[in-house]
Amino acid sequence: MPNPVNRVSLLLIAINLLLAGNAHAARTSLDESVAAAMANFQVKIPAAPQLVEKAVGILVFPKVYKAGFVLGGGIGDGALQIRGETVQYYRTTSLSYGFQLGVQWRTEIVMFMSQEALDKFRSGNGWQAGIDGSIAVIAFGVGNSIDTDNIQEPIIGFIFDDKGLMFDLSLKGSKYWKVEEHPASN
């Protein structure tokens, strides 16, 4: 007669192995999405390569989903990269109110241009734009160019979708949370 404890143990081991495999696949998927978002950013924004070179850290959210009907919210998973390597996973959330209807997604990239700004961001458990620090959202200038030499802000942000850079948008009120495990493995 088979031992029920052995069956349960084997089942738990099998589930654990499946979940570990799925977590690895999910992490790989997010890492691939982050890499694709950075490549897309460097194609769509002419000054991106110079800004990437100057940044001490880059927070990349490949897809932030926004939905609303008067009251709205957004959520997305991403990664903090330093010198092109992922050092921590993050989640962003936001709430908004006003005229809004529907669901959309967008890519958000936040660049830390000073070590002090990056250290302050990383030191807390949560960080809110507009309260813990300001993010200067960059829009195209005259002739669709960005003057990288005159950017003095310690934290700059870009919001774009598959059509390109989005205008008149803000990251104010967005909250950023460290995710100890890979977001999809939770």
Language-model-detected regions and their locations in the chain:
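Bacterial N-terminal signal peptides that target proteins for export
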Residues: 1-11
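Bacterial N-terminal signal peptides
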Residues: 9-20
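Signal peptide processing junction and immediate N-terminal pro/mature segment
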Residues: 22-24
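Small-residue-enriched, tightly packed secondary-structure blocks
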Residues: 26-186
